Amino acid sequence: MNSQVKNKAVYWGTGRRKTSVARVRLIPGNGQIKINGRSGDDYLNFNPSHLNSVKAPLLTLGLENSYDIFVNVFGGGLTGQADAIKQGAARALCGLSPDNRKPLKTEGHLSRDPRSKERKKYGLKKARKAGQFSKR
């Protein structure tokens, strides 16, 4: 999924994790990250694990200083949003070149993490936590 913006190729990808959804654009540039109009460092609270997660697909292909990442993300918390951005960036890189798919897939950047919060059941305090058992 690519389009042209001012004679530059733009590659789109969508990522999801828990309840977060990220729409990612990759544009040839110098490696800056913008998330919801803010810098990536600022948006992710300078958390190195979240920043590394966002940059992981580009690092896998050695393109960390070749593309700018522009993201619109909503829903969930920072961890879910960071992983959604990672998946969206990986999908956008697959649009860049079909050869990128294999290394990204072996690193696990293209797979959707199916884990999500388990619902609370009636009669219990939380999803699995029951009240204290009394024998007598």
From Swiss-Prot:
SUPFAM superfamilies: Ribosomal protein S5 domain 2-like (SSF54211)
GO biological process: translation
GO function terms (MF aspect): RNA binding; structural constituent of ribosome
Compositionally biased residues, Basic residues: 117-136
Cellular-component GO terms for this entry: cytosolic small ribosomal subunit
Bias-annotated ranges (Basic and acidic residues): 99-116
Keywords: Ribonucleoprotein, Ribosomal protein
InterPro entries documented for this protein: Ribosomal_Su5_D2-typ_SF (IPR020568), Ribosomal_uS9 (IPR000754), Ribosomal_uS9_bac/plastid (IPR023035), Ribosomal_uS9_CS (IPR020574), Ribsml_uS5_D2-typ_fold_subgr (IPR014721)
Segments for region (Disordered): 95-136
Regions crossing the membrane: none
Family, similarity comment: Belongs to the universal ribosomal protein uS9 family.
HAMAP family per UniProt: Ribosomal_uS9_B (MF_00532_B)
Name of the featured protein: Small ribosomal subunit protein uS9
Organism: Prochlorococcus marinus subsp. pastoris (strain CCMP1986 / NIES-2087 / MED4)
Lineage: Bacteria, Bacillati, Cyanobacteriota, Cyanophyceae, Synechococcales
Gene (name only): rpsI
